[in-house]
């Protein structure tokens, strides 16, 4: 069925709520409004306001309440309205949610999913366009994932909700309206922690996640017209990282370019580069390169396109690798 990224998430939430009465949604404007991106549209009407709960604008309280519900046997799903709004909840997520497994020796579970629209592409400035994923990927006790397609949005939200671990679920907001085919009745083709090889290639490996996967695939098409084949990998899981899939590719291509919207400095690309350098040093034909946002907040709408990684910047990095 052809559907949008947002509609695929909606169906995933609906199916999870149908399957388990303990699945409860919490967030700002998710009920009557259906969320600012309409991901939860009609769910309150169909399941009631005791399972789709409109909350005050207080992210720390939202996550704290959901955490308490998770400890009592529910499977809450929180929507943080915009990426920059997650910071008031940072203490709850990092100091409480992430630590409960270790604090109790694994005896207490916290099946909590925190959905966060992230990244640019919609012309919104600071607080509404940010890439905070690395803060959570750095935190032991959290799974951090990001789908890039409607099909993965559906399957990954179902998998995340079913886990007994807390999951931070980053949704690339500029992909909410992307359309592709989704099999709502099939089983997931990959575990939640596995990366996906989107295109096979021999000259260089390009790793991306979230909103930059489509950009990397566009770059691969342009490279093919110029006689170069790129292997594009959708990371999907930001923590844990599927190093095996990346390493297998790099051992074949000898070159690696990592793409993300977040600033390059101390970004997730730095961790991937370090791990691949440690593991594949003698296979590398060129330094590992990174393409990311600049070391500034997301700029105003008219400047945003210059801030986000684009095919030209990716291809320039690939050319540097091939010339080494």
Question: What label would you give each PLM region?
Answer:
Residues 1-166, 170, 175, 306, ...:
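Thiamine diphosphate
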